[in-house]
């Protein structure tokens, strides 16, 4: 006895039997595979929505004999203990991962009823891949404890498919402790489903993009503290989290249209909003007065920022908004330690005067500022990013003796650096280099970015005095001078000269076992440089040099683990034979045809103790991000 109108419990689609195996069925809509347990009689059930079944139960017990027969069939079903489950989950695994199966314990004991029956939770093929890659097991054998290892999950569409990023650590918390979390990526053809995410109940940080979230769909995530989302509105997010919204501590959201539902997240300590151009009113921020970190980027429709006066617990504030005209609200923030103002219309920096709590300050592209002098009164600063690019006088920064990280753009001179003897990291870009030797006078300097400067910027001899440098980046720059001083620095581990032109005096080069990472992508080499000026125009003569004809100089650096030489018209890789420690070599977009020499390098492609160097770009990186 059987009912042949079988429907998929997940989507309601018809299930058809496999012609070769009558114990297996496939949903014609979602393609889920099911089987009928062989120990029991073969009975097929047509699953119907609960409301439909209840309405049927209330009908009068009158009808044809056919209706009575159908009722008898249902009675038989209650006794026969049918188990209908997806193929990858069997009854013996239901105790390990019950939500994966059709949970038929009630049927087996004769207690199955309309109220107790459960629709099966089916998981996507991408989730199967994720579990296999991350845990080395199938979804049918994984336990809740093992699923609880996932702390971070992100999902976005890439060229190769969906990139599922995961970690067994919380990367945001690791970053706060100065550590890097181990993050892994799995490429899948489809996005994860909401029910997949809901199974990872111990997630702490979730990153979603363009995802539809049904009500209550994330309520199982009992440990969730941080969410990054794009094109997901606050009302949908609040309903999806249910009671868990109360516990959310950090929210990074892009493309929001309204802040009206912000009160649904009373536990927020950190809020970041980016590219929310539809929002003109931010008064709802008053509903989250316990905020400690706030970031408002691309909020160009906002004109009124007075609500910030009530956020008295803020420790970090970042604003990128072209209608911001005043920053007096910082006077109401006694614990403010990090402040970043970008692309504003502020005229006066007077509220900064003597702001003792500030440790980090970034002022970028605020072209209407009349006077930067208040910056010089912040004696407690440890990090300063000053993007000036105006003809106004540079501020007197001699009082900032505690500064450890400095980025200076568009300054009229750099002599002031001589008083900042505590600097450990320095970026000088677009500045008038009136006294290059002052950089060599910084005794603690470890990291230097030196790009696109003018004045005496071609004189690179000052580098010889930077004996403590471990990192040097001079990418995207034109130097009519000799950079061999950089190659000889005894402590230098990373050197980046991408997309730059310069001279290398190869005769001056010395063996340097400290250098482990070198990037020379798209370089232009000179020699015999001659320059003269008539006071108005500078003339330059030089001879071109081919890197392909001078690669033997790389033998001076036997400890190299990372080497990148993209787009240099290279025809030969013989230079690599002596670089026995190479882990990674990038020679793309060259003219190399014979790569047999690489077979001699036993470590190539086997991981490196040195991070791949990333060249500095024009955008300002500051210490305030809480991603």
Protein language model regions, located:
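Residues immediately within or flanking Cys/His clusters that coordinate Zn2+
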Residues: 3-5, 24
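Short cysteine-rich clusters marking metal-coordination/redox-active sites
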Residues: 8-11, 27-30
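Short linker/helix segments within small regulatory modules
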Residues: 17-26
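Short metal-binding segments enriched for Cys and/or His
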Residues: 34-48
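Alpha-helical transmembrane anchor segments and their immediate juxtamembrane flanks
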Residues: 61-95
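N-terminal, intrinsically disordered, polar/charged segments of Gram-positive cell-envelope systems
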Residues: 93-136
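Concave beta-strand-loop units of leucine-rich repeat
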Residues: 152-193, 202-217, 223-236, 247-258, ...
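Hydrophobic anchor residues at the C-terminal helix/turn of individual leucine-rich repeat
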Residues: 197, 218-221, 241-243, 262-265, ...
């Amino acid at each position: 006895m059987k009912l042949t109108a079988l429907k998929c419990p997940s989507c309601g689609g018809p299930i058809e039997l496999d012609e070769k195996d009558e114990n297996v069925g496939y949903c014609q809509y979602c393609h889920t595979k099911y089987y009928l347990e062989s120990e029991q009689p073969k009975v097929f059930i047509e699953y119907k929505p609960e409301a439909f079944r209840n309405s049927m139960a209330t009908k009068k017990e009158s009808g044809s004999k056919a209706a009575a027969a159908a009722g008898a069939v249902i009675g038989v079903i209650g006794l026969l203990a049918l188990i209908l489950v997806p193929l990858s989950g069997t009854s013996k695994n239901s105790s390990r991962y019950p939500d994966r199966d059709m949970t038929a314990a009630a049927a087996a004991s004769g207690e199955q009823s309309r109220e107790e029956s459960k629709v099966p939770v089916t998981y996507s093929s991408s989730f199967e891949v994720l579990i296999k890659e991350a845990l080395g097991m199938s979804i049918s054998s994984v336990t809740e404890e093992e699923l609880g290892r996932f702390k971070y999950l992100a999902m976005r569409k890439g060229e190769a498919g969906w990139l599922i990023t995961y970690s067994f650590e919380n990367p945001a918390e690791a970053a706060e402790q100065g550590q890097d979390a181990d993050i892994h990526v799995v490429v899948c053809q489809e996005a994860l489903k909401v029910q997949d995410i809901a199974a990872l109940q111990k997630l702490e940080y979730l990153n979603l993009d363009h995802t539809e979230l049904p009500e209550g769909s994330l309520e199982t995530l009992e440990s969730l503290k941080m969410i990054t989302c794009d094109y997901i509105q606050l009302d949908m997010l609040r309903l999806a989290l249910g009671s868990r919204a109360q516990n959310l501590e950090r929210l990074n959201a892009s493309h929001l249209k309204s802040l009206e539902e912000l009160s649904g997240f009373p536990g927020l300590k950190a809020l970041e909003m980016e590219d929310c151009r539809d929002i003109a009113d931010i008064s709802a921020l008053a509903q989250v007065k316990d905020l400690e970190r706030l970031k408002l980027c691309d909020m160009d429709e906002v004109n009124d920022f007075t609500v910030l006066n009530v956020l008295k617990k803020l420790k970090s504030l970042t604003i990128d908004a072209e209608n911001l005209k005043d920053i007096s609200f910082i006077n109401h923030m006694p614990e403010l330690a990090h402040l970043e103002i970008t692309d504003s219309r502020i005229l006066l920096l007077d509220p900064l005067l003597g702001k003792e709590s500030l440790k980090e300050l970034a002022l970028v592209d605020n072209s209407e500022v009349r006077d930067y002098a208040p910056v010089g009164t912040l004696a407690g600063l440890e990090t300063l990013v000053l993007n000036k690019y105006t003809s106004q006088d540079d501020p007197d920064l001699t009082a900032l003796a505690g500064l450890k990280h400095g980025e200076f753009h568009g300054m009229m001179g750099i002599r002031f650096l001589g008083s900042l003897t505590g600097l450990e990291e320095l970026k000088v870009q677009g500045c008038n280099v009136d006294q290059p030797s002052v950089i060599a006078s910084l005794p603690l300097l470890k990291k230097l970015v030196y790009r696109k400067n003018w004045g005496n910027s071609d004189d690179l001899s000052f580098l010889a005095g930077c004996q403590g440098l471990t990192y040097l980046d001079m990418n995207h720059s034109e130097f009519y001078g000799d950079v061999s001083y950089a190659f000889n620095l005894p402590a230098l581990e990373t050197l980046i000269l991408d997309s730059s032109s310069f001279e290398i005096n190869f005769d001056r080069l010395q063996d340097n076992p400290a250098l482990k990472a070198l990037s020379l992508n798209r370089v232009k080499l000179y020699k015999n440089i001659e320059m003269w000026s008539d006071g108005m125009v500078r003339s330059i003569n030089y001879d071109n040099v081919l890197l392909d004809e001078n690669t033997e100089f790389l033998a001076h650096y036997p400890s190299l683990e990372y080497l990148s030489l993209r787009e240099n018209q290279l025809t030969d890789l013989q230079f690599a034979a002596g670089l026995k420690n190479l882990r990674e070599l990038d020679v793309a977009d060259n003219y190399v045809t014979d790569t047999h020499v690489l077979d001699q390098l036993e470590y190539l492609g086997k991981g490196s103790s040195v991070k791949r160097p990333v060249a500095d770009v024009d955008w300002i990186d500051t210490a305030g991000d809480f991603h």
